[in-house]
Amino acid sequence: DYDTLRKVNPGLVMLHVSGYGQTGPYSERPGVGTLAEAFSGYAHVTGEPDGPPTLPSFPLADGVAALTGTYAVLAALWARDRNGGIGDEIDISLYEPLLSMTGPMLINFTKGGVVSNREGNRARWSTPRNTYKTKDNRWIAVSSAADSPAMRLFQAIGREDLTTNPAWATNRERLKRVDECDNMIA
């Protein structure tokens, strides 16, 4: 354990990564990335609005926990080198780093009881934002919350008229026409 090893090397930095952390009510439970993606709420907000919660097809929780752990170890090494050579023990669960990705959704739920729903490739704060099939049967991803990229997109699809139309000039106005925007681009 860390306390034993620290006696031999006071500068030791040790990282633990587990499903639910080293302490707490779930600490003894086995944990894998898929469970973390569900437990964190990530799967609940991913997928199409009328579909089931969707898990990523790649090890998202594992990768995010690895990046978080790497950052934590680097920060602990930096602190150790500046604060007298004393190491640290770091505890990261697979699910907690995913909470930072769900950010406002978690806060909206815990503070206001608002449950976020699945939105597919859309975002309630930006339009156009989606994936669209092209005429040559390929797919493109578009995200134009800022007005200038949206105007360039409208020009690219032959809808220059929208670049001077106040109903399409700002993201706020475009959000009133999400379905129309998607249908026009698709």
Could you tell me what each predicted segment is?
Residues 1-145:
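Active-site-adjacent "lid/gating" segments in soluble enzymes
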